[in-house]
Amino acid sequence: MITQILLTQTFIMFILMILGLILSKTGLLTEHGSKDMVNILLYAVIPCVIIRSYITDFTMEKLYGLLMSAVLAVAAFAVAIAVSYIIYGMRKPIDNFGTAFCNAGFIGIPLVTAVFGNEAAFYVASFASILNLLQWTYGIVIITRRKDMINIKKVFVNPVTISLVIGLFLFITGIKLPGVINSTMAGVAALNTPAAMIVLGYYLSCVRIRDLLLNPSLYLASFVRLIIIPLLTLLVLYIIPAGHGQIGMITLIAAATPVGTSTAIFAQKFGQNYERAVCMVCLSTLLSIITMPVVMYLAQMWIM
Protein backbone atom coordinates (compact mmCIF):
# COMPACT_ATOMS: atom_id res chain seq x y z
CA MET A 1 0.00 0.00 0.00
CA ILE A 2 2.75 2.45 0.99
CA THR A 3 4.78 1.54 -2.10
CA GLN A 4 1.78 2.09 -4.37
CA ILE A 5 1.04 5.51 -2.85
CA LEU A 6 4.69 6.55 -3.19
CA LEU A 7 4.81 5.35 -6.79
CA THR A 8 1.71 7.41 -7.60
CA GLN A 9 2.99 10.52 -5.82
CA THR A 10 6.46 10.39 -7.36
CA PHE A 11 4.89 10.03 -10.81
CA ILE A 12 2.71 13.09 -10.11
CA MET A 13 5.87 14.97 -9.13
CA PHE A 14 7.51 13.88 -12.37
CA ILE A 15 4.57 15.28 -14.39
CA LEU A 16 4.84 18.57 -12.49
CA MET A 17 8.57 18.70 -13.27
CA ILE A 18 7.79 18.26 -16.96
CA LEU A 19 5.27 21.10 -16.67
CA GLY A 20 8.00 23.32 -15.22
CA LEU A 21 10.33 22.33 -18.05
CA ILE A 22 7.67 23.20 -20.66
CA LEU A 23 6.93 26.54 -18.99
CA SER A 24 10.64 27.36 -19.07
CA LYS A 25 11.19 26.29 -22.67
CA THR A 26 8.20 28.37 -23.82
CA GLY A 27 9.44 31.43 -21.94
CA LEU A 28 6.55 31.48 -19.48
CA LEU A 29 8.87 30.76 -16.54
CA THR A 30 12.08 32.78 -16.38
CA GLU A 31 15.14 32.62 -14.12
CA HIS A 32 13.82 35.60 -12.17
CA GLY A 33 10.42 33.94 -11.83
CA SER A 34 11.96 30.69 -10.58
CA LYS A 35 13.93 32.59 -7.93
CA ASP A 36 10.71 34.31 -6.83
CA MET A 37 9.02 30.91 -6.55
CA VAL A 38 11.89 29.60 -4.41
CA ASN A 39 11.48 32.60 -2.09
CA ILE A 40 7.73 31.96 -1.86
CA LEU A 41 8.41 28.33 -0.99
CA LEU A 42 11.06 29.15 1.62
CA TYR A 43 9.38 32.11 3.29
CA ALA A 44 5.67 31.31 2.97
CA VAL A 45 4.82 27.77 1.91
CA ILE A 46 7.17 25.67 4.08
CA PRO A 47 6.43 27.76 7.23
CA CYS A 48 2.69 27.24 6.67
CA VAL A 49 3.23 23.50 6.24
CA ILE A 50 5.23 23.27 9.47
CA ILE A 51 2.98 25.49 11.60
CA ARG A 52 -0.18 23.68 10.44
CA SER A 53 1.37 20.32 11.32
CA TYR A 54 1.58 21.40 14.98
CA ILE A 55 -2.02 22.58 15.24
CA THR A 56 -3.16 19.46 17.04
CA ASP A 57 -4.23 18.45 20.53
CA PHE A 58 -1.35 18.04 22.98
CA THR A 59 -0.77 14.54 24.34
CA MET A 60 2.26 12.97 25.99
CA GLU A 61 2.19 10.26 23.32
CA LYS A 62 2.59 12.86 20.56
CA LEU A 63 5.33 14.65 22.50
CA TYR A 64 7.19 11.35 22.92
CA GLY A 65 6.75 10.64 19.21
CA LEU A 66 8.12 14.09 18.38
CA LEU A 67 11.21 13.50 20.51
CA MET A 68 11.73 10.06 18.96
CA SER A 69 11.41 11.52 15.45
CA ALA A 70 14.14 14.03 16.32
CA VAL A 71 16.41 11.26 17.66
CA LEU A 72 15.86 9.15 14.54
CA ALA A 73 16.51 12.19 12.33
CA VAL A 74 19.87 12.73 14.06
CA ALA A 75 20.71 9.06 13.50
CA ALA A 76 19.74 9.33 9.81
CA PHE A 77 21.89 12.41 9.29
CA ALA A 78 24.80 10.79 11.11
CA VAL A 79 24.66 8.01 8.52
CA ALA A 80 24.34 10.43 5.59
CA ILE A 81 27.14 12.72 6.71
CA ALA A 82 29.50 9.82 7.49
CA VAL A 83 28.91 8.10 4.14
CA SER A 84 29.27 11.34 2.17
CA TYR A 85 32.48 12.28 3.95
CA ILE A 86 34.02 8.82 3.51
CA ILE A 87 33.30 8.85 -0.23
CA TYR A 88 34.00 12.51 -1.06
CA GLY A 89 35.85 14.08 1.88
CA MET A 90 36.48 17.81 1.43
CA ARG A 91 37.86 17.53 -2.11
CA LYS A 92 34.40 17.49 -3.76
CA PRO A 93 32.28 19.93 -1.75
CA ILE A 94 29.20 19.89 -4.00
CA ASP A 95 29.03 16.08 -4.11
CA ASN A 96 29.61 15.88 -0.35
CA PHE A 97 26.92 18.46 0.42
CA GLY A 98 24.41 17.07 -2.08
CA THR A 99 24.65 13.48 -0.92
CA ALA A 100 24.60 14.40 2.77
CA PHE A 101 21.55 16.68 2.61
CA CYS A 102 18.30 15.45 1.12
CA ASN A 103 15.17 17.21 -0.13
CA ALA A 104 13.08 16.58 2.98
CA GLY A 105 11.23 19.90 2.77
CA PHE A 106 10.00 20.05 -0.81
CA ILE A 107 9.68 16.30 -1.46
CA GLY A 108 9.79 14.53 1.92
CA ILE A 109 6.96 16.44 3.58
CA PRO A 110 4.43 16.02 0.73
CA LEU A 111 5.28 12.32 0.34
CA VAL A 112 4.93 11.68 4.07
CA THR A 113 1.56 13.46 4.21
CA ALA A 114 0.37 11.55 1.13
CA VAL A 115 1.21 8.22 2.79
CA PHE A 116 0.30 8.87 6.43
CA GLY A 117 -1.98 11.92 6.31
CA ASN A 118 -1.50 15.58 7.25
CA GLU A 119 -0.89 14.76 10.91
CA ALA A 120 2.35 12.96 9.93
CA ALA A 121 3.89 16.31 8.98
CA PHE A 122 4.03 16.84 12.76
CA TYR A 123 6.93 14.36 12.90
CA VAL A 124 8.71 15.07 9.61
CA ALA A 125 8.91 18.78 10.52
CA SER A 126 11.55 17.95 13.14
CA PHE A 127 13.57 16.17 10.44
CA ALA A 128 13.39 19.27 8.23
CA SER A 129 14.44 21.49 11.13
CA ILE A 130 17.51 19.39 11.92
CA LEU A 131 18.34 19.36 8.20
CA ASN A 132 18.18 23.14 8.16
CA LEU A 133 20.42 23.41 11.24
CA LEU A 134 23.05 21.09 9.77
CA GLN A 135 23.06 22.83 6.40
CA TRP A 136 23.83 26.20 7.96
CA THR A 137 26.63 24.78 10.14
CA TYR A 138 28.36 21.65 8.83
CA GLY A 139 27.09 22.33 5.30
CA ILE A 140 28.67 25.78 5.24
CA VAL A 141 32.01 24.27 6.29
CA ILE A 142 31.77 21.72 3.44
CA ILE A 143 30.92 24.31 0.80
CA THR A 144 33.39 27.03 1.85
CA ARG A 145 36.04 24.95 3.68
CA ARG A 146 35.95 27.72 6.30
CA LYS A 147 34.43 27.46 9.78
CA ASP A 148 34.36 31.25 10.14
CA MET A 149 31.70 31.43 7.40
CA ILE A 150 29.08 29.94 9.74
CA ASN A 151 26.39 32.54 10.39
CA ILE A 152 24.91 31.82 13.83
CA LYS A 153 22.06 34.24 13.18
CA LYS A 154 20.95 32.31 10.09
CA VAL A 155 21.19 29.03 12.00
CA PHE A 156 18.46 30.12 14.39
CA VAL A 157 16.73 33.01 12.61
CA ASN A 158 15.31 31.44 9.46
CA PRO A 159 11.84 30.49 8.23
CA VAL A 160 12.07 26.82 9.23
CA THR A 161 13.30 27.43 12.78
CA ILE A 162 10.90 30.31 13.41
CA SER A 163 7.91 28.34 12.13
CA LEU A 164 8.98 25.35 14.25
CA VAL A 165 9.07 27.53 17.38
CA ILE A 166 5.63 28.97 16.57
CA GLY A 167 4.27 25.49 15.88
CA LEU A 168 5.65 24.04 19.12
CA PHE A 169 4.18 26.98 21.06
CA LEU A 170 0.74 26.34 19.56
CA PHE A 171 1.06 22.60 20.22
CA ILE A 172 2.14 22.92 23.86
CA THR A 173 -0.28 25.72 24.79
CA GLY A 174 -3.22 24.29 22.86
CA ILE A 175 -3.99 27.69 21.30
CA LYS A 176 -6.19 27.35 18.22
CA LEU A 177 -5.91 29.72 15.29
CA PRO A 178 -9.08 31.32 13.85
CA GLY A 179 -10.68 29.25 11.11
CA VAL A 180 -10.04 31.83 8.40
CA ILE A 181 -6.29 31.90 9.21
CA ASN A 182 -6.11 28.12 9.35
CA SER A 183 -7.86 27.85 5.98
CA THR A 184 -5.55 30.45 4.45
CA MET A 185 -2.48 28.59 5.71
CA ALA A 186 -3.89 25.34 4.33
CA GLY A 187 -4.23 26.94 0.90
CA VAL A 188 -0.67 28.25 0.97
CA ALA A 189 0.70 24.92 2.25
CA ALA A 190 -0.99 23.12 -0.66
CA LEU A 191 1.40 24.93 -3.03
CA ASN A 192 4.39 22.98 -1.69
CA THR A 193 4.45 20.07 -4.12
CA PRO A 194 3.40 21.80 -7.37
CA ALA A 195 5.56 24.90 -6.86
CA ALA A 196 8.65 22.93 -5.81
CA MET A 197 8.38 20.50 -8.72
CA ILE A 198 7.80 23.28 -11.25
CA VAL A 199 10.98 24.97 -10.00
CA LEU A 200 12.85 21.68 -10.38
CA GLY A 201 11.45 21.48 -13.91
CA TYR A 202 12.95 24.90 -14.58
CA TYR A 203 16.31 23.67 -13.26
CA LEU A 204 16.03 20.67 -15.59
CA SER A 205 15.48 22.97 -18.57
CA CYS A 206 18.74 24.79 -17.80
CA VAL A 207 21.04 21.79 -18.17
CA ARG A 208 22.17 20.01 -21.31
CA ILE A 209 20.80 16.47 -21.56
CA ARG A 210 24.28 15.21 -22.45
CA ASP A 211 25.76 16.72 -19.29
CA LEU A 212 22.93 15.25 -17.24
CA LEU A 213 22.77 11.71 -18.61
CA LEU A 214 26.35 10.95 -19.73
CA ASN A 215 28.32 11.87 -16.60
CA PRO A 216 29.21 8.77 -14.52
CA SER A 217 30.06 10.84 -11.43
CA LEU A 218 26.48 12.17 -11.32
CA TYR A 219 25.17 8.60 -11.28
CA LEU A 220 27.58 7.78 -8.45
CA ALA A 221 26.27 10.73 -6.42
CA SER A 222 22.68 9.65 -7.10
CA PHE A 223 23.53 6.06 -6.12
CA VAL A 224 25.00 7.27 -2.83
CA ARG A 225 22.07 9.59 -2.12
CA LEU A 226 19.24 7.27 -3.22
CA ILE A 227 20.51 3.75 -2.49
CA ILE A 228 23.48 3.52 -0.11
CA ILE A 229 22.36 6.12 2.43
CA PRO A 230 18.68 5.02 2.59
CA LEU A 231 19.62 1.34 2.95
CA LEU A 232 22.14 2.05 5.71
CA THR A 233 19.55 4.28 7.39
CA LEU A 234 17.05 1.42 7.13
CA LEU A 235 19.58 -0.87 8.82
CA VAL A 236 20.04 1.63 11.68
CA LEU A 237 16.27 1.99 12.07
CA TYR A 238 15.95 -1.80 12.15
CA ILE A 239 18.50 -2.02 14.97
CA ILE A 240 16.95 0.80 17.03
CA PRO A 241 13.63 -0.30 18.65
CA ALA A 242 12.20 3.22 18.26
CA GLY A 243 12.91 3.00 14.53
CA HIS A 244 10.12 0.52 13.96
CA GLY A 245 6.58 1.55 13.01
CA GLN A 246 5.21 4.76 11.54
CA ILE A 247 7.82 7.17 12.89
CA GLY A 248 10.60 4.99 11.50
CA MET A 249 8.92 4.93 8.08
CA ILE A 250 8.45 8.71 8.16
CA THR A 251 12.16 9.14 8.92
CA LEU A 252 13.14 6.79 6.11
CA ILE A 253 10.91 8.49 3.53
CA ALA A 254 12.54 11.83 4.37
CA ALA A 255 16.04 10.30 4.37
CA ALA A 256 15.49 8.58 1.01
CA THR A 257 14.58 11.77 -0.86
CA PRO A 258 16.93 13.02 -3.62
CA VAL A 259 19.60 15.71 -3.50
CA GLY A 260 18.10 18.83 -1.96
CA THR A 261 17.49 21.99 -3.99
CA SER A 262 19.51 23.73 -1.28
CA THR A 263 22.59 22.20 -2.93
CA ALA A 264 22.08 24.44 -5.96
CA ILE A 265 21.12 27.43 -3.80
CA PHE A 266 24.23 27.10 -1.59
CA ALA A 267 26.49 26.45 -4.60
CA GLN A 268 25.32 29.66 -6.25
CA LYS A 269 25.52 31.65 -3.03
CA PHE A 270 29.08 30.57 -2.16
CA GLY A 271 30.60 30.50 -5.64
CA GLN A 272 30.78 26.74 -6.18
CA ASN A 273 29.91 24.71 -9.29
CA TYR A 274 26.26 25.71 -9.69
CA GLU A 275 25.76 23.79 -12.95
CA ARG A 276 26.93 20.53 -11.39
CA ALA A 277 24.71 21.11 -8.36
CA VAL A 278 21.68 21.60 -10.63
CA CYS A 279 22.54 18.40 -12.53
CA MET A 280 22.79 16.47 -9.26
CA VAL A 281 19.42 17.77 -8.10
CA CYS A 282 17.71 16.99 -11.42
CA LEU A 283 19.18 13.53 -12.05
CA SER A 284 18.66 12.30 -8.49
CA THR A 285 15.08 13.61 -8.51
CA LEU A 286 14.32 11.77 -11.76
CA LEU A 287 15.90 8.53 -10.48
CA SER A 288 14.08 8.80 -7.14
CA ILE A 289 10.84 8.02 -8.97
CA ILE A 290 12.19 4.46 -9.20
CA THR A 291 14.35 4.16 -6.08
CA MET A 292 12.03 5.51 -3.39
CA PRO A 293 9.21 2.98 -3.94
CA VAL A 294 11.81 0.16 -3.98
CA VAL A 295 13.39 1.32 -0.70
CA MET A 296 9.95 1.66 0.91
CA TYR A 297 9.00 -1.83 -0.26
CA LEU A 298 12.02 -3.22 1.58
CA ALA A 299 11.27 -1.05 4.60
CA GLN A 300 7.76 -2.46 4.95
CA MET A 301 9.29 -5.90 5.50
CA TRP A 302 11.89 -4.67 7.99
CA ILE A 303 10.43 -1.96 10.20
CA MET A 304 6.65 -1.98 9.77
Feature annotation, model-predicted:
Residues 1-304:
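Alpha-helical transmembrane segments of multi-pass small-molecule/ion transporters
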